[in-house]
Protein backbone atom coordinates (compact mmCIF):
# COMPACT_ATOMS: atom_id res chain seq x y z
CA UNK A 1 0.00 0.00 0.00
CA UNK A 2 1.23 3.48 -0.79
CA UNK A 3 2.72 5.67 1.92
CA UNK A 4 0.83 8.50 3.59
CA UNK A 5 2.81 11.00 1.50
CA UNK A 6 1.55 9.64 -1.80
CA UNK A 7 -0.30 12.22 -3.88
CA UNK A 8 -3.80 11.04 -4.72
CA UNK A 9 -6.11 12.51 -7.34
CA UNK A 10 -9.63 11.16 -7.73
CA UNK A 11 -11.70 11.26 -10.89
CA UNK A 12 -14.82 9.43 -9.82
CA UNK A 13 -16.91 8.62 -6.80
CA UNK A 14 -19.45 5.85 -6.91
CA UNK A 15 -22.47 5.24 -4.79
CA UNK A 16 -22.99 1.74 -3.47
CA UNK A 17 -25.23 -0.03 -5.97
CA UNK A 18 -27.41 -2.72 -4.42
CA UNK A 19 -27.24 -5.86 -6.55
CA UNK A 20 -28.17 -4.39 -9.93
CA UNK A 21 -30.69 -6.65 -11.68
CA UNK A 22 -29.93 -9.53 -9.30
CA UNK A 23 -32.61 -11.10 -7.13
CA UNK A 24 -31.84 -12.68 -3.76
CA UNK A 25 -31.93 -16.20 -5.18
CA UNK A 26 -29.40 -15.41 -7.90
CA UNK A 27 -27.06 -13.80 -5.40
CA UNK A 28 -27.40 -16.74 -3.02
CA UNK A 29 -26.57 -19.26 -5.74
CA UNK A 30 -23.62 -17.18 -6.94
CA UNK A 31 -22.24 -16.86 -3.41
CA UNK A 32 -22.65 -20.60 -2.83
CA UNK A 33 -19.96 -21.21 -5.45
CA UNK A 34 -17.68 -18.38 -4.31
CA UNK A 35 -15.02 -18.15 -1.64
CA UNK A 36 -15.78 -15.52 1.02
CA UNK A 37 -12.91 -13.59 2.52
CA UNK A 38 -12.72 -10.71 5.00
CA UNK A 39 -10.21 -7.89 4.60
CA UNK A 40 -9.16 -5.15 7.05
CA UNK A 41 -9.41 -1.47 6.17
CA UNK A 42 -6.84 -0.11 3.67
CA UNK A 43 -5.68 -3.52 2.46
CA UNK A 44 -4.50 -4.03 -1.11
CA UNK A 45 -6.42 -7.03 -2.44
CA UNK A 46 -4.38 -6.95 -5.65
CA UNK A 47 -1.80 -4.70 -7.26
CA UNK A 48 -0.45 -4.09 -10.79
CA UNK A 49 1.40 -7.17 -11.99
CA UNK A 50 -0.60 -9.62 -9.86
CA UNK A 51 -2.26 -12.50 -11.73
CA UNK A 52 -5.64 -11.54 -13.18
CA UNK A 53 -7.95 -14.50 -12.87
CA UNK A 54 -10.58 -13.67 -10.25
CA UNK A 55 -13.93 -11.88 -10.17
CA UNK A 56 -14.84 -10.13 -6.90
CA UNK A 57 -18.27 -9.31 -5.49
CA UNK A 58 -18.56 -6.86 -2.60
CA UNK A 59 -20.76 -8.44 0.08
CA UNK A 60 -20.15 -5.68 2.61
CA UNK A 61 -17.90 -2.66 2.97
CA UNK A 62 -16.39 -0.32 0.40
CA UNK A 63 -13.38 -0.58 -1.94
CA UNK A 64 -11.50 1.69 -4.31
CA UNK A 65 -9.91 1.04 -7.69
CA UNK A 66 -6.65 2.95 -8.08
CA UNK A 67 -4.23 3.52 -10.95
CA UNK A 68 -0.63 3.99 -9.81
CA UNK A 69 1.76 6.24 -11.73
CA UNK A 70 5.51 5.74 -12.09
CA UNK A 71 6.17 8.64 -9.71
CA UNK A 72 4.03 6.96 -7.00
CA UNK A 73 1.06 9.26 -7.53
CA UNK A 74 -2.29 7.53 -7.40
CA UNK A 75 -5.39 8.18 -9.47
CA UNK A 76 -8.52 6.88 -7.77
CA UNK A 77 -10.74 5.56 -10.53
CA UNK A 78 -13.75 4.70 -8.42
CA UNK A 79 -15.32 3.81 -5.09
CA UNK A 80 -17.55 0.72 -5.04
CA UNK A 81 -19.77 -0.77 -2.35
CA UNK A 82 -21.95 -3.72 -1.46
CA UNK A 83 -23.73 -5.37 -4.35
CA UNK A 84 -21.08 -4.47 -6.93
CA UNK A 85 -18.70 -6.61 -8.95
CA UNK A 86 -15.02 -5.70 -9.20
CA UNK A 87 -12.36 -7.11 -11.52
CA UNK A 88 -14.99 -7.98 -14.11
CA UNK A 89 -12.97 -6.92 -17.17
CA UNK A 90 -11.21 -10.28 -17.24
CA UNK A 91 -14.50 -11.93 -18.13
CA UNK A 92 -14.50 -10.09 -21.46
CA UNK A 93 -10.89 -9.05 -22.18
CA UNK A 94 -8.06 -11.54 -21.80
CA UNK A 95 -5.29 -10.23 -19.55
CA UNK A 96 -2.65 -12.12 -17.59
CA UNK A 97 -1.97 -9.47 -14.96
CA UNK A 98 -3.74 -6.67 -13.10
CA UNK A 99 -3.12 -3.08 -14.15
CA UNK A 100 -4.69 -1.32 -11.15
CA UNK A 101 -4.91 -1.57 -7.36
CA UNK A 102 -7.97 -2.88 -5.53
CA UNK A 103 -7.85 -1.41 -2.02
CA UNK A 104 -10.38 -1.67 0.78
CA UNK A 105 -11.70 1.62 2.20
CA UNK A 106 -13.40 -0.07 5.16
CA UNK A 107 -13.50 -3.57 6.61
CA UNK A 108 -14.84 -5.69 3.76
CA UNK A 109 -16.21 -9.10 3.00
CA UNK A 110 -15.63 -10.08 -0.62
CA UNK A 111 -16.80 -13.09 -2.60
CA UNK A 112 -14.15 -14.39 -4.98
CA UNK A 113 -14.43 -16.80 -7.90
CA UNK A 114 -12.07 -17.52 -10.76
CA UNK A 115 -13.10 -16.55 -14.27
CA UNK A 116 -12.52 -20.12 -15.42
CA UNK A 117 -14.72 -21.59 -12.70
CA UNK A 118 -17.48 -19.03 -13.33
CA UNK A 119 -17.48 -19.74 -17.06
CA UNK A 120 -17.87 -23.44 -16.27
CA UNK A 121 -20.76 -22.74 -13.90
CA UNK A 122 -22.46 -20.61 -16.56
CA UNK A 123 -22.67 -23.79 -18.64
CA UNK A 124 -23.93 -25.94 -15.75
CA UNK A 125 -25.50 -25.10 -12.38
CA UNK A 126 -25.56 -21.32 -12.90
CA UNK A 127 -26.86 -21.53 -16.45
CA UNK A 128 -30.30 -20.04 -15.59
CA UNK A 129 -28.60 -17.19 -13.71
CA UNK A 130 -25.90 -16.40 -16.27
CA UNK A 131 -27.93 -13.83 -18.28
CA UNK A 132 -28.90 -11.94 -15.12
CA UNK A 133 -25.35 -11.91 -13.74
CA UNK A 134 -23.84 -10.78 -17.04
CA UNK A 135 -26.54 -8.13 -17.45
CA UNK A 136 -25.84 -6.78 -13.96
CA UNK A 137 -22.14 -6.57 -14.77
CA UNK A 138 -22.92 -4.83 -18.06
CA UNK A 139 -25.11 -2.25 -16.32
CA UNK A 140 -22.37 -1.55 -13.80
CA UNK A 141 -19.78 -1.11 -16.53
CA UNK A 142 -22.06 1.32 -18.36
CA UNK A 143 -22.73 3.36 -15.23
CA UNK A 144 -19.03 3.50 -14.43
CA UNK A 145 -18.22 4.74 -17.92
CA UNK A 146 -20.86 7.47 -17.67
CA UNK A 147 -19.64 8.46 -14.21
CA UNK A 148 -16.02 8.61 -15.32
CA UNK A 149 -16.96 10.78 -18.31
CA UNK A 150 -18.88 13.17 -16.06
CA UNK A 151 -16.03 13.43 -13.55
CA UNK A 152 -13.42 13.93 -16.26
CA UNK A 153 -15.50 16.80 -17.62
CA UNK A 154 -15.53 18.38 -14.18
CA UNK A 155 -11.75 18.24 -13.95
CA UNK A 156 -11.41 19.77 -17.40
CA UNK A 157 -14.05 22.50 -17.25
CA UNK A 158 -14.88 23.37 -13.62
CA UNK A 159 -12.85 25.36 -11.11
CA UNK A 160 -11.97 23.95 -7.69
CA UNK A 161 -14.96 25.51 -5.93
CA UNK A 162 -17.46 24.00 -8.36
CA UNK A 163 -15.71 20.61 -8.18
CA UNK A 164 -15.88 20.64 -4.39
CA UNK A 165 -19.56 21.60 -4.37
CA UNK A 166 -20.47 18.83 -6.80
CA UNK A 167 -18.30 16.31 -4.97
CA UNK A 168 -19.99 17.14 -1.67
CA UNK A 169 -23.35 16.56 -3.32
CA UNK A 170 -22.03 13.22 -4.61
CA UNK A 171 -20.93 12.29 -1.09
CA UNK A 172 -24.37 13.22 0.27
CA UNK A 173 -25.77 10.30 -1.74
CA UNK A 174 -23.28 7.79 -0.31
CA UNK A 175 -24.52 5.21 2.24
CA UNK A 176 -22.23 6.74 4.88
CA UNK A 177 -24.00 10.12 4.69
CA UNK A 178 -26.35 10.91 7.60
CA UNK A 179 -29.60 12.83 7.67
CA UNK A 180 -29.45 16.21 9.44
CA UNK A 181 -32.27 18.65 10.28
CA UNK A 182 -30.69 21.20 7.94
CA UNK A 183 -29.60 18.83 5.19
CA UNK A 184 -27.02 16.04 5.10
CA UNK A 185 -24.11 15.44 7.45
CA UNK A 186 -20.89 14.14 5.92
CA UNK A 187 -17.68 12.99 7.52
CA UNK A 188 -14.82 14.06 5.26
CA UNK A 189 -11.43 15.58 6.03
CA UNK A 190 -9.86 18.41 4.07
CA UNK A 191 -7.21 15.99 2.87
CA UNK A 192 -9.77 13.48 1.63
CA UNK A 193 -11.76 16.20 -0.09
CA UNK A 194 -8.58 17.47 -1.75
CA UNK A 195 -7.91 13.98 -3.09
CA UNK A 196 -11.44 13.74 -4.41
CA UNK A 197 -11.18 16.89 -6.51
CA UNK A 198 -7.47 17.10 -7.32
CA UNK A 199 -6.33 20.11 -5.30
CA UNK A 200 -4.22 20.84 -2.22
CA UNK A 201 -5.52 20.38 1.32
CA UNK A 202 -5.04 24.09 1.92
CA UNK A 203 -7.13 24.96 -1.13
CA UNK A 204 -9.90 22.61 0.01
CA UNK A 205 -9.90 24.29 3.40
CA UNK A 206 -10.15 27.76 1.88
CA UNK A 207 -13.04 26.70 -0.36
CA UNK A 208 -14.94 25.17 2.57
CA UNK A 209 -14.46 28.38 4.53
CA UNK A 210 -15.84 30.41 1.61
CA UNK A 211 -18.80 28.07 1.12
CA UNK A 212 -19.59 28.35 4.81
CA UNK A 213 -19.46 32.15 4.59
CA UNK A 214 -21.85 31.93 1.63
CA UNK A 215 -24.31 29.94 3.74
CA UNK A 216 -24.10 26.72 1.72
CA UNK A 217 -22.71 24.50 4.47
CA UNK A 218 -21.20 24.32 7.93
CA UNK A 219 -17.78 22.72 8.33
CA UNK A 220 -16.08 21.83 11.59
CA UNK A 221 -13.22 19.38 11.79
CA UNK A 222 -14.12 16.36 9.66
CA UNK A 223 -17.85 17.08 9.85
CA UNK A 224 -19.60 18.94 7.04
CA UNK A 225 -23.32 19.72 7.08
CA UNK A 226 -24.47 20.35 3.53
CA UNK A 227 -27.61 22.47 3.67
CA UNK A 228 -30.76 21.64 1.74
CA UNK A 229 -29.85 18.16 0.53
CA UNK A 230 -32.31 15.90 2.37
Curated annotation (Swiss-Prot):
GO terms for cellular component: cytosol. Residues 158-230 form the HTH crp-type domain. Signal peptide: none annotated. InterPro entries: cNMP-bd_dom (IPR000595), cNMP-bd_dom_sf (IPR018490), Env_Response_Regulators (IPR050397), HTH_CRP (IPR012318), RmlC-like_jellyroll (IPR014710), Tscrpt_reg_HTH_Crp-type_CS (IPR018335), WH-like_DNA-bd_sf (IPR036388), WH_DNA-bd_sf (IPR036390). GO terms for biological process: regulation of DNA-templated transcription. A nucleoside 3',5'-cyclic phosphate binds at residues 18-139. SUPFAM superfamilies: cAMP-binding domain-like, Winged helix' DNA-binding domain. Disulfide bonds: none annotated. GO terms for molecular function: catalytic activity; cyclic-di-GMP binding; DNA binding; DNA-binding transcription factor activity; protein dimerization activity. Keywords: Activator, Allosteric enzyme, c-di-GMP, Cytoplasm, DNA-binding, Repressor, Transcription, Transcription regulation, Virulence. Binding of c-di-GMP appears to trigger the active Clp conformation into an open form or inactive state, hence abolishing its DNA-binding ability. Global transcriptional regulator that regulates virulence factors production by activating or repressing the expression of a large set of genes in diffusible signal factor (DSF) pathway. Homodimer. NCBIfam families: PRK11753.1. This is CRP-like protein Clp. It comes from Xanthomonas oryzae pv. oryzae (strain KACC10331 / KXO85). The gene is clp.
Amino acid sequence: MSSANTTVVTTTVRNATPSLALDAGTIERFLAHSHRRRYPTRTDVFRPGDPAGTLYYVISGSVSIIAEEDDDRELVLGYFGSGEFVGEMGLFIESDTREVILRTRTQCELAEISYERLQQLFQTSLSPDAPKILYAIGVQLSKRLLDTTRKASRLAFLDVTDRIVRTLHDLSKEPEAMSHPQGTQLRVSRQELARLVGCSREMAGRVLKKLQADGLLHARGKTVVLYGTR
